[in-house]
């Protein structure tokens, strides 16, 4: 979910829609439905990545203001216990050479606000977590992830300040230290989401080079609300969701050539599976500003916007399967699907829960 949309609609809130509308959108009960079981112990678990070993996942909780700042937490799959591993203002570590922009020397303050995240094994063998951050600064924060099994910790190592006037959303890393990031919209002038999802071009993808310490725009990525992104392991191709266009594009980075495109309703975050396919979170197609505003006005429970998690074949650029779909309880507005073994974990940009879906037999 793009930051500018979240903040704009949160500001409109109940004053625009009325408390009855917001309440009607809320799912309060925390009970299983079919093969999906909600775990109601979170605050806006917008994005997540699998940790090595398959015993835990790392979740980024998304805040929208000084009152609801974000954090990073580890969720243990067997015990279902969660542990906060990073909050802004708590790190005393200094920036480390080779981790981001040398001009970024201080860790985030207490206004830290996690958005899109990605995890990569660097060429030097260390695990690097990249976090889009909006609170104390618009930047990609770089953390080292250390541990094993269910015992994990993170340490801040550096950051890369965002390009001027860019509201970033998602990030996709390469092992050599380079990464790609989506600019959903400019910071100024603000894009109007009050009536519907924009259909005009609002952003693109940036590539950041560890060697040059600089950004460049990736050709062929101008789109209506660029959102989720993953990269091929060698960094040759990127797969970008364009929420306002209902599409996922495959673009060759070096040339800006569009290799393929798939139609996906209101696509959000993307995640690789172990067998080399891409999971796309897809919200209902014809969302209005009122729909989304009702969601961010919810103070308890979960949003009920219909969504599905679909499977993209990255070679043919076709949707080959719907892994999960729901309209209402036990959770709506899914923004990321992460497969770990025979289970699917789903997060949301606004609400108190994640979904744990049993995929055995699928």
Task: Spell out what each predicted region is.
Residues 25-44, 99-102, 154, 320-325:
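A short helix->beta-strand "capping" segment at the edge of beta-propeller domains
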Residues 76-80, 145-149, 208-213, 252-256, ...:
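Short loop/turn segments that connect beta-strands within beta-propeller blades
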């Amino acid at each position: 979910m793009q930051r500018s949309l979240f903040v704009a609609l949160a500001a409109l809130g109940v004053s625009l829609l009325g408390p009855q509308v917001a309440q009607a959108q809320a799912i309060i009960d925390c009970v299983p439905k079919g093969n999906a079981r909600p775990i109601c112990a979170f605050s806006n678990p917008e994005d997540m990545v699998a940790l090595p070993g398959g015993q835990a996942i790392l979740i980024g909780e998304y805040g929208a203001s000084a009152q609801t700042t974000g954090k990073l937490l580890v969720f243990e799959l067997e015990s279902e216990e969660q542990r906060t591993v990073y909050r802004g203002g708590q790190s005393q570590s200094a920036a480390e050479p080779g981790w981001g922009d040398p001009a970024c020397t201080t860790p985030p303050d207490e206004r830290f606000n996690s958005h899109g995240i990605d995890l990569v094994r660097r060429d030097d063998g260390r695990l690097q977590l990249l976090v889009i951050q909006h609170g104390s600064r618009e930047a990609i924060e770089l953390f080292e992830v250390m541990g094993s099994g269910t015992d994990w910790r993170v340490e801040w190592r550096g950051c890369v300040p965002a390009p001027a006037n860019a509201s970033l959303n998602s990030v996709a890393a390469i092992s050599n230290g380079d990464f790609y990031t989506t600019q959903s919209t400019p910071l100024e002038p603000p894009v109007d989401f009050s009536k519907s999802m924009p259909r005009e071009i609002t952003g693109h993808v940036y590539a950041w080079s560890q060697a040059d310490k600089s950004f460049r725009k990736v050709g062929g990525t101008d789109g209506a609300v660029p959102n989720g992104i993953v990269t091929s392991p060698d960094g040759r191709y990127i797969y970008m969701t364009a929420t306002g266009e209902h599409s996922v594009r495959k673009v060759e980075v070096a040339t800006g050539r569009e290799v393929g495109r798939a139609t996906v309703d209101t696509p959000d975050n993307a995640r690789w599976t172990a067998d080399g396919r891409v999971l796309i979170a897809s919200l209902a197609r014809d969302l209005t500003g009122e729909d989304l505003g009702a969601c961010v006005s919810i103070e308890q429970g979960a949003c009920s916007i219909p969504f599905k998690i679909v499977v993209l074949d990255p070679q043919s650029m076709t949707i080959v399967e719907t892994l999960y779909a729901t309209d209402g309880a036990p959770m709506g507005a899914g923004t990321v699907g992460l497969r770990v073994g025979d289970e699917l974990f789903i997060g949301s940009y606004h609400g108190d829960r994640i979904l744990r879906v049993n995929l055995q037999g699928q």
